[in-house]
């Protein structure tokens, strides 16, 4: 998973990585 840890730290970054 790309940015799995990032998602927990910043939900907005998680969305950015998903797209």
UniProtKB/Swiss-Prot annotation:
Name the record gives this protein: Thrombin-like enzyme gabonase
Entry note: thermal dependence: Optimum temperature is 30 degrees Celsius with tosyl-Arg-methyl ester (TAME) as substrate and 37 degrees Celsius with natural substrates.
Tissue-specific expression: Expressed by the venom gland.
Organism in which the protein naturally occurs: Bitis gabonica (Gaboon adder)
GO cellular component: extracellular region
Free-text function comment from the UniProt entry: Thrombin-like snake venom serine protease. Releases both fibrinopeptides A and B from fibrinogen (FGA and FGB) to form fibrin clots. Also activates factor XIII (F13A). The activity of the enzyme is stabilized by calcium ion.
Subunit details: Monomer.
Annotated compartments: Secreted
